[in-house]
């Protein structure tokens, strides 16, 4: 991947997704894994830091409909993927710069880290971003993302529990048995 586009060229592939805990967790829970793949880190970093602009996504008070949220979420995910792979390659300074740029470029008040969405894809994407923040040692941002995700997931659980079915204890026990 070069920046935000795939390029078809002969290459020796590595498997950076093996370094991601979220990739393994999604696969174990039948979610099919993530989109994390081998990247041309130098080209991706150059494109994201020098060429890409967020087009006003950092402005306060902007509303995004579901389709626009999906697109902006993909951008946040790509920055997270690049930052996590950079950190795995020992390039934490560059990873931190990527996280800083996306944080400045996408206002979390307009596009929260945790949010109900189709197939819960918003929260899945945020989990990739959360892991990238930890890998890049951006612990303050990681804590904000973790708190928002946990709050949203708990609210979703409470909603579904109110409909009947499993109690919180039964649900927690389900995950503790694995």
Name each region found by the language model.
Residues 1-178:
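ER/secretory pathway lumenal C-terminal domains and tails of membrane proteins involved
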């Amino acid at each position: 991947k070069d920046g935000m586009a795939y390029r078809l060229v002969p290459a020796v592939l590595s498997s950076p997704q093996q370094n991601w805990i979220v990739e393994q967790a999604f696969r174990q829970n039948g979610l099919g894994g993530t989109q994390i793949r081998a990247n041309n880190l130098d080209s991706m970093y150059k494109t994201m830091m020098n060429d890409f602009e967020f087009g006003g996504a950092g402005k306060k008070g902007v509303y995004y409909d579901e389709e626009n949220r999906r697109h902006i979420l993909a951008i946040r995910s790509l920055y997270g993927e690049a930052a996590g792979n950079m950190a795995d390659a020992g390039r934490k300074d560059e990873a931190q710069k990527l996280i800083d740029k996306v944080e400045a470029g996408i206002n979390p008040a307009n596009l929260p880290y945790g949010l109900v969405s189709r197939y819960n894809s918003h929260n899945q994407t945020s989990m990739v971003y959360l892991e990238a923040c930890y890998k890049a040692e951006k612990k303050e941002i990681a804590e904000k993302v973790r708190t928002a995700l946990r709050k949203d997931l708990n609210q979703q659980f409470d909603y579904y529990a109110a409909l009947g079915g499993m109690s919180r204890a039964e649900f927690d026990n389900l995950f503790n048995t694995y």
